[in-house]
Amino acid sequence: MEGADLLTAGVLFLFAAVAAVPLAARLGIGAVLGYLLAGIAIGPWGLGFISDVDEILHFSELGVVFLMFIIGLELNPSRLWQLRRSIFGVGAAQVLLSAAVLAGLLMLADFLWQAAVVGGIGLAMSSTAMALQLMREKGMNRSESGQLGFSVLLFQDLAVIPALALVPLLAGSADEHFDWFKVAMKVLAFAVMLIGGRYLLRPVFRFIAASGVREVFTAATLLLVLSAALFMDALGLSMALGTFIAGVLLAESEYRHELENAIDPFKGLLLGLFFISVGMSLNLGVLYTHLLWVAASVVILVVIKMLTLYLLARLYGIRSSERMQFASVLSQGGEFAFVLFSTASSQRLFQGDQMALLLVTVTLSMMTTPLLMKGIDKWLSRRLNGPEENDEKPWVEDDKPQVVVVGFGRFGQVIARLLMANKMRITVLERDIGAVNLMRKYGYKVYYGDATQVELLRSAGAEAAESIVITCNEPEDTMKLVALCQQHFPHLHILARARGRVEAHELLQAGVTQFSRETFSSALELGRKTLVSLGMHPHQAQRAQLHFRRLDMRMLRELIPEHSDMVQISRAREARRELEEIFQREMQQERRQLDGWDEFE
């Protein structure tokens, strides 16, 4: 693709994303389906703006690559070892069972047995990009079903290597073309990457971080991710697997959070590009000429994978309320099918339109998943939020609540319990099914649902409530909810949880002044106790704590992100000097009796 064409394609991709995703969100079908529909619109079977789909699809895999690197950063080797049973037990069972059933059905559809085996393996795989994105949107990444889903996806990525090696064997060209020496060299190169990364990455990043230039650190992070992807691609292995391993190797390093922040903006944009590319690859000509075959294939594929996953989730001990989510989020075909089927086609395993039919089936199955998840969400809402005969009497009645509490994790539970102990009428919204089930057993009236949906907030009593307390784990959800309340429920008094200074700044800029940084108060309290343990009088330590709190809050308001780094550094130094002067005046002016004030009074 020429430079000018690449620039034009980039503009078209950005325009499609900007136009389609907000429209999809307004229609309530989700960002992923919006990207897919945008791809169909600008692709060769839509308006025809872009025709070189294969090249763009390969480039767009970088979105999955960046996503897997961030996931690797969140898992250390010890955590992976803990997941070994679910990875090699449930993951292997899912791939083998689904592949066997699907291969048998393809043989009944006049596929050669070799092509049926490849087709079954390819269709058994799920879309890592789509599944992880949907799990994050639905809050599944912290639940037991989400962890199991990730384990299955990880095994599927590991299965890429033997699956690709199997294709030439099935094609009957093993003796003529299959070079075992090359395979051994690839394994050796992979081992060198693991060992080298284990001992070299941290010293290299330590050297780069010492420069103090953030842009260089970001560039080094991009270099690491892209190099790992290219290295694995050169070996004929999964690019996503290579970057996942790089992330795991850095998961226990002191640069983990900085690496994640550097990559995150690129990940989101490139994931969108990937979904648009998948939409562009949909062959509407094949769909039109084989409509019944494709429609039946999509239904059969989704049903078989859902049944297999549901059965495995039940055997693994996943709660019944979470099994449907787990089964549906992995029910689609995946991006690996494009690679595997192309390799099989080059070995002439497929006949006629067989490859095109399989690819159309995979693409359409990916489009069904957001709709399927939306339908299951509604079903779960009716099931979990409806009245039950064996429900215990709730602590408070939820008719016309005074307060809506969003999130019932450790932070939200403390707030909700305090409000209920003071006889306040509250409604609690939580999108973790496991937490909803557990809390309802203890008599809490917790409702399942995504609070970023206006209709759910309205049915929860937001129009009648006086306040809303937002305790979401994800900062993006918090800011989205703030904007939603300001637009649709301007009367609500908004109180929010801030995970740190960055989110506190965002809340202030959005006009939210009542917020609590989750670790700030507890850290101040422990600091006060430390001062007392060092011999400071309890009253002085208490006043020092109050002075520090007031000054820090003032600095938080003054040091907004619009200021340059030098201005912020200068102002922070002034604040530190000001704090020291306040404490010195306190020491000079207050000469109190050591037994004149008791911190436990």
Swiss-Prot record:
Entry similarity comment: Belongs to the monovalent cation:proton antiporter 2 (CPA2) transporter (TC 2.A.37) family. KefB subfamily.
Quaternary assembly: Interacts with the regulatory subunit KefG.
Stated name of the protein: Glutathione-regulated potassium-efflux system protein KefB
Entry function: Pore-forming subunit of a potassium efflux system that confers protection against electrophiles. Catalyzes K(+)/H(+) antiport.
PANTHER family (UniProt xref): K(+) EFFLUX ANTIPORTER 3, CHLOROPLASTIC
Domain called RCK N-terminal: residue spans: 400-519
GO molecular function annotations of the record: glutathione-regulated potassium exporter activity
Predominant place of localization: membrane
Membrane-spanning intervals of the chain: 4-24, 29-49, 55-75, 87-107, 111-131, 152-172, 177-197, 207-227, 230-250, 262-282, 284-304, 324-344, 356-376
Keyword Ion transport: yes
BP-aspect Gene Ontology terms: proton transmembrane transport
Membrane topology value: Multi-pass membrane protein
GO CC entries: plasma membrane
UniProt xrefs under HAMAP family: K_H_efflux_KefB (MF_01412)
A Pfam family: Na_H_Exchanger
Record key words, sorted: Antiport, Cell inner membrane, Cell membrane, Ion transport, Membrane, Potassium, Potassium transport, Transmembrane, Transmembrane helix, Transport
NCBIfam families: 2a37, PRK03659.1
InterPro entries listed in its UniProt record: Cation/H_exchanger_TM, K/H_exchanger, K_H_efflux_KefB, K_uptake_TrkA, Na+/solute_symporter_sf, NAD(P)-bd_dom_sf, RCK_N
Compartments (UniProt record): Cell inner membrane
Superkingdom of origin organism: Bacteria
